[in-house]
From Swiss-Prot:
Gene: ispD
Similarity remark: Belongs to the IspD/TarI cytidylyltransferase family. IspD subfamily.
Name recorded for this polypeptide: 2-C-methyl-D-erythritol 4-phosphate cytidylyltransferase
Taxonomic lineage: Bacteria, Bacillati, Bacillota, Bacilli, Bacillales
Biological pathway: Isoprenoid biosynthesis; isopentenyl diphosphate biosynthesis via DXP pathway; isopentenyl diphosphate from 1-deoxy-D-xylulose 5-phosphate: step 2/6
Keyword Transmembrane helix: no
PANTHER family: 2-C-METHYL-D-ERYTHRITOL 4-PHOSPHATE CYTIDYLYLTRANSFERASE, CHLOROPLASTIC
Cited NCBIfam families: ispD, PRK13385.1
EC numbers: 2.7.7.60
A Pfam entry, by short name: IspD
This protein's UniProt keywords: Isoprene biosynthesis, Nucleotidyltransferase, Transferase
Length: 232
């Protein structure tokens, strides 16, 4: 099954305390951006990549794409919005007539083809599928610095990206959110409101989002582990 990809790289990464977009921070000699995008470029089912970035970084993205020898017809660069949801909407406007679209956070550099495979199976069966992992830690609801309750984690999942949807479904979800002025934290939260069932497929505990400086040493360790697995 072919798909188009909306690749989000417009975030400012303020929590990373970097002086630049965290996409351009290097992880073992290459920008996070490249690590996150490479698996999709290697996947022949990915027919088009729509990179959503800040306008002032468009030239830099083009240069990186040229270095990677990516065919021009396969890449389109669009300006991001003030919120994640608006950036996704901008990307969706540039999607073609394909059936399926994946949305991925560029700050997640450890996506694997296995996860993409599971998502494509999930979206074929359910029209909407997201990858996630079971919550491991005890979770508590807190108000004003005081624990209110311990949440039953049995049915709690940590949601990741990519997230996969039939293109008309995700477009409809964004139209509804815009009409009702709803701002969600991921695409699934919009699709759920249509309503449309969203299937869960197994993600990976390695598939972390790089958000704060503390994540970088962990990312280097994960990259080393994944490299070791690949070389076994």
């Amino acid at each position: 099954m072919n798909y188009e990809l909306v690749f989000l790289a417009a975030g400012q990464g303020k929590r990373m305390n970097a002086q630049k977009n965290k996409m351009w921070l290097e992880l073992v000699g290459e920008p996070i951006f490249i690590h996150a995008l490479r698996p999709f470029l290697a996947d022949n089912r990915c027919s088009k990549v729509i990179v959503v970035c800040q306008e002032e970084e468009r030239k830099h993205v083009k240069e990186l794409m040229s270095q990677l020898n990516v065919a021009e017809h396969r890449i389109e660069i669009v300006k991001g919005g003030s919120e994640r949801q608006y950036s996704v909407a901008a990307g969706l406007e540039r999607c073609g007539t394909g059936r399926v679209v994946l949305v991925h956070d560029g700050a997640r550099p450890f996506i694997t083809l296995d996860i993409i495979d599971r998502l494509l199976i999930g979206v074929e069966q359910s029209k909407a599928a997201i990858c996630a992992v079971k919550v491991k830690d005890t979770v508590k609801r807190v108000m004003n610095g005081v624990v209110q309750e311990t949440v039953d984690r049995e049915n709690l999942w940590q949601v990741q990206t990519p997230q996969a949807f039939e293109l008309p479904i995700l477009r409809k979800a964004h139209q509804l959110a815009r009409k009702e002025q709803f701002l969600g934290t991921d695409e699934a939260s919009l699709v759920e409101r249509i309503p449309c069932p969203v299937a869960i497929v197994q993600g990976s505990y390695y598939n972390i989002k790089l958000t704060t400086p503390e994540d970088m040493p962990l990312a280097k360790a994960i990259l080393g582990e994944l490299g070791g697995i690949a070389n076994d």
